[in-house]
Amino acid sequence: MKSTVTKIAEKTYQLPVSYKDCMRVPGNVYLDELLFENLQEDVFEQIANVACLPGIQKYSLAMPDCHYGYGFCIGGVAAFDEVTGVISPGGVGFDINCGVRLVKTNLTKNDVTPKLKELLSEIFKNVPSGLGSKGKIRITKDEIDSVLEEGVSWAVEEEYGWERDIKHIEEHGKMKEADPTLVSDNAKKRGLPQLGSLGSGNHFLEVQYVDEIFDEEAAKTFGVSPDQVVLMIHTGSRGLGHQICADYLRYMENAAKKYNIKLPDRQLACAPINSEEGQKYFKAMSCGANYAWANRQLITHWIRESFESVFKTSAEDLEMDIIYDVAHNIAKKEQHLVDGVLKNVVVHRKGATRAFGPGHAEIPSDYVNIGQPVIIPGDMGTASYLMHGTEKAMEQTFGSTAHGAGRALSRVKALKLYTGNEVQEALQKKGILVMADSKGVIAEECPEAYKDIENVADICHDSGISLKVAKMKPMGVVKG
């Protein structure tokens, strides 16, 4: 298949429509030569399969951190016409609104280093983590409906945060289309005890410091400066989101047959966006997204309390404001230019970050001249990046960019090659403290299991789909 792929621009490759009879649009992939050579053939197959779905616009896209996934590849992006297109749970994923939040402080690396172990211990104690972890709060079935409907607004009303937090969250932390009646009792049952917990796998809380500034104006606008300590939170909708996806995958398989949609892969089960089935999934998925935003909000609150406890200063005085919060597993109703015409589309981003350019109405007013903040986390031993969206992303990728480093090794392979103790000791030698619910998670999430984040960030920057603002390096990590 790679023999049919051509390089069409800087760090951009294209899979032609001639590759597969059913392809309606070409597939564009953002890679450099090294990642192109190493990318699995089956990822190209998944990109081609998505290009076969009804109503797809312009391109089937894959970001630099792409790898094999369920239905869409991880790192896959596709926009579908709101009238003729489809919506697919395989284009969102099981962890609905898995996403990343960046919180700033007015502390420096030197302020935090002497108290880092105490701080990590306090965070580890205050934020439940690990497989099957349960949150510290207990909510009723009626209350979970409020969470699913209101998202971050519910958390702020319950005094888990500040009113001003809301403006620096994608969608203001609330998908308005959410309808809790379309979420199964089983999904709610899974979500009830887990609200306010980190979960396991690649989810993490990380204490970082700003190592390098690339764009002084953007950094000043976003409120970051050299040696400043920031917090990164990476988690999603826990078991509730997983159950919503599982419930609707079965539902969508029947819908695809009902509407005579020819699927190149049954994992791409879908329904017309405006059908009863399509609308039900979109509204249930919106509930999962709202749960995830509320989840990150509760965790933010407990991290603020952890800092207050260790530094004997209020979170307000520590200036612990949210820089931004982005979703990277979601489907969104957006407007984009397609062949010079402004169209209503539903953009699927699965392991991809929204990256709206300067001037867009949905960007917070204090950031509108720069572009939307984009947060691209690395792994436990490497840097993370704060970037911003661009007009080029609006033109080429429906305002989308990468979401992280992307896996290079499966969890099973990582466990065979490394032990948790080895990884923990190696990180400690680099001055990075790690706390986790299990040593197995540390091994599974070792730095070697991921692609080079520097490479991914460079491709995004060089191709112009997002631009570097700052580079952060880890000081301490809490893993699920």
From Swiss-Prot:
EC number: 6.5.1.8
Residues the entry annotates as binding GMP: 202-206, 328-329, 377-380, 384, 403-406, 479
Catalysed reactions, as listed in the record: a 3'-end 3'-phospho-ribonucleotide-RNA + a 5'-end dephospho-ribonucleoside-RNA + GTP = a ribonucleotidyl-ribonucleotide-RNA + GMP + diphosphate; a 3'-end 2',3'-cyclophospho-ribonucleotide-RNA + a 5'-end dephospho-ribonucleoside-RNA + GTP + H2O = a ribonucleotidyl-ribonucleotide-RNA + GMP + diphosphate + H(+)
Active site: 403
GO biological process: tRNA processing
Entry GO MF terms: GTP binding; metal ion binding; RNA ligase (ATP) activity; RNA ligase (GTP) activity
Cofactor comment text: Binds 2 manganese ions per subunit.
Ligand binding (Mn(2+) 2): 98, 234, 328
SUPFAM superfamilies the UniProt entry points to: Hypothetical protein PH1602 (SSF103365)
Description of how the protein assembles with itself and partners: Monomer.
Function: Essential for tRNA splicing and maturation. Acts by directly joining spliced tRNA halves to mature-sized tRNAs. Joins RNA with 2',3'-cyclic-phosphate or 3'-phosphate ends to RNA with 5'-hydroxy ends.
Homology family: Belongs to the RtcB family.
Name recorded for this polypeptide: tRNA-splicing ligase RtcB
Organism: Methanococcus maripaludis (strain DSM 14266 / JCM 13030 / NBRC 101832 / S2 / LL)
UniProt lineage: Archaea, Methanobacteriati, Methanobacteriota, Methanomada group, Methanococci
Record gene name: rtcB
